[in-house]
Amino acid sequence: MKITQARLAAVAALTSGAAAITCDKASLQSAFPSIATVDFAQWMPANSTFSIPKGNVAYPTSPTKLRAACAVQVSVKNGTSNYGFGLFLPDDWNGRFLAVGNGGFAGGINWLDMAAGLGYNFAVMSTNTGHNSTSSDGKWAYHNEDALLDWGYRAMHGSTVLAKELTTAYYSNPILYSYYSGCSTGGRQGLRDIQLYPEDFDGVVAGAPAWWTNHLQPWTTKVGSYNLPNTSASHIPVSLFPVIGAEVMRQCDGADGVVDTIISDPNACDFDPNALLCTPASNASACLTPPQLNTLFQIYSDYVDTNQTFVFPHLWKGSELQWFVLLGGLTNEPNNLGDDYVKYFLNRGPQWQWQDFDYGVVQQADAEDPGNATADDFDALSRFQARGGKLLHYHGMSDGLIATGSSVYLYSKILQTLAPKGVNLDSFYRFFLVPGMQHCSGTPSTVNAPWYFAGANQAGSVSTSVSGVPGFRDAKHDVLLAMMDWVEKGVAPTEIIATKWVNDTLQDKVMRQRPLCMWPKKQRWSGKGDVNQASTWSCE
Ligand SMILES: *[C@@H]1O[C@H](CO)[C@@H](O)[C@H](O)[C@H]1NC(C)=O
Ligand SMILES: *[C@@H]1O[C@H](CO)[C@@H](O)[C@H](O)[C@H]1NC(C)=O
Ligand SMILES: *[C@@H]1O[C@H](CO)[C@@H](O)[C@H](O)[C@H]1NC(C)=O
Ligand SMILES: *[C@@H]1O[C@H](CO)[C@@H](O)[C@H](O)[C@H]1NC(C)=O
Ligand SMILES: *[C@@H]1O[C@H](CO)[C@@H](O)[C@H](O)[C@H]1NC(C)=O
Ligand SMILES: *[C@@H]1O[C@H](CO)[C@@H](O)[C@H](O)[C@H]1NC(C)=O
Ligand SMILES: *[C@@H]1O[C@H](CO)[C@@H](O)[C@H](O)[C@H]1NC(C)=O
Ligand SMILES: *[C@@H]1O[C@H](CO)[C@@H](O)[C@H](O)[C@H]1NC(C)=O
């Protein structure tokens, strides 16, 4: 690996005359500027459990069976900006830095995703984004512009800068390469960071990004309102979502050429919802009335408002089994991720209710963009491209939280902005759809799609001790290893093989593997052999 003279000189300057930095609070503190305070530093022998510090309501799950490492937590006060971050510094360092992301409005250090990164021997960092909260709670943002800016981008950038300084000082060596991996809000954080600070990361893996947050959040309330109030004749009860999903499966599964419980081309399916209409012959608990079919029509339609303004794309066919998140669980309200944004990010106040929603909410969100969080500076990605950065973006086709079409739209906006300037998108940005995957991870048991490729949150969604892709630790099956090959060896991924294990334990038998294709290519089965083997598929 090449280390430039300039980088070596920078390290020499940083470490000259200073005593070696060790894993204790005072020693680590000596490597920091005064804005940063080391809260604790604790060396963990191999196979340890890291006990999550009290008060971390966002990420309470303790990772287990860790590699030997120094665990550090840091608090930062930088003018009006306040945030913290956690850092694992492995004994057996791979010379590289990884930052991981957060989810929803979560305020807390994501130690569980950090642990998955530690399994590759990265020095790995997560920021708390500047506040304490669960992922669906936005109250902290009320009339608090500084907390919003920290959440929007400041905490990620500042944490990255400081964690890199600490990493360099601890090892007395430069960082060879820096990576980022996050999903949902984590996907947004990665995109926003490289739009503002193209030098922060050499490679960014962004899953199901909440990039268009100032439209996504209002849409969350809008789409929820289609199915409310729950006493209305047009309300579709949660119990009917699997019924709708089964009918979509019946009509759309074969549209990709193979009937295999995986819908991989939902837009090629000419779905006829009238097959669900209640008639005297129907099973009354497995059909929809005309007003309910009207609601279904709304759910499958883009949100377009005044003057034909496109606000947000619709949920895709095949996402029905995750609809309980946005379309009514047991409450009579849209999801908090929409309502809290309007109440506390747009400062309409706690009295605001979803019945008050109108296009003015979208206009205000457009004008204010709370926290400067929306990752829509497509043009800025040319700076990331120019300095050699690589971006890998993916989205599950069965996502019921962030409409899959918002990622397709992101791809087209980046294309429309950069292609006219002569930028070859494939040279630095590649997008992959994941048939049958829900939001960031998982697949319904009636679908059983290959969904695991070591994307952000995936290891943590099945276990407290998994890292990477067990049994398939290579760049063909592991998106982070694929990114490393792209950045370090110039080997760009054309497909990623996703894996589905029996029972999702990552230890049972492999049930299915299948390549995910680089957009706009689609999966095509060869027509010969076992559809559950990746080798019988290609991307065309
Ligand atoms: C790791 O710790 C667990 C208990 O937490 C123990 O059962 C196991 O034997 C240990 N493994 C190794 C390799 O030390
Ligand atoms: C978050 O919680 C921690 C632990 O309880 C506390 O020390 C810290 O002050 C809190 N931060 C904010 C911004 O409220
Ligand atoms: C501190 O704040 C300054 C001014 O806003 C900003 O430029 C800098 O990136 C911040 N640094 C960190 C480490 O947060
Ligand atoms: C009617 O539909 C419900 C819900 O899908 C199902 O549980 C039940 O078995 C069906 N009844 C008959 C008689 O098919
Ligand atoms: C819609 O278009 C009309 C005519 O161009 C314009 O006067 C009006 O302000 C627009 N409304 C909104 C909400 O943008
Ligand atoms: C409607 O919402 C109310 C309030 O949350 C709840 O108590 C009730 O069970 C819901 N009814 C249905 C049919 O879901
Ligand atoms: C918001 O981001 C833009 C770049 O996208 C930048 O020009 C502007 O200064 C930022 N505003 C704040 C308040 O951080
Ligand atoms: C999967 O789980 C089921 C029960 O949840 C169990 O009966 C079955 O043996 C498991 N399969 C494997 C391969 O472990």
Language model segments and positions:
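Fungal secretory targeting signals
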Residues: 1-22
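Catalytic-loop region of hydrolases
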Residues: 15-96, 111-112, 258-263, 272-352, ...
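Short, solvent-exposed loop/turn and secondary-structure capping segments
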Residues: 83-86, 109-114, 135-139, 190-196, ...
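Cap/lid segment of the alpha/beta-hydrolase catalytic domain
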Residues: 104-172, 218-219, 226, 350-365, ...
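Alpha/beta-hydrolase fold nucleophile elbow
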Residues: 173-184
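Glycine-rich nucleophile elbow surrounding the catalytic serine of serine-hydrolase chemistry
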Residues: 182-192
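A catalytic-pocket lid/entrance helix-loop region that shapes and gates access to the active site
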Residues: 192-194, 199-304, 449-475
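C-terminal subdomain of alpha/beta-hydrolase-fold enzymes, centered on the catalytic histidine
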Residues: 308-515
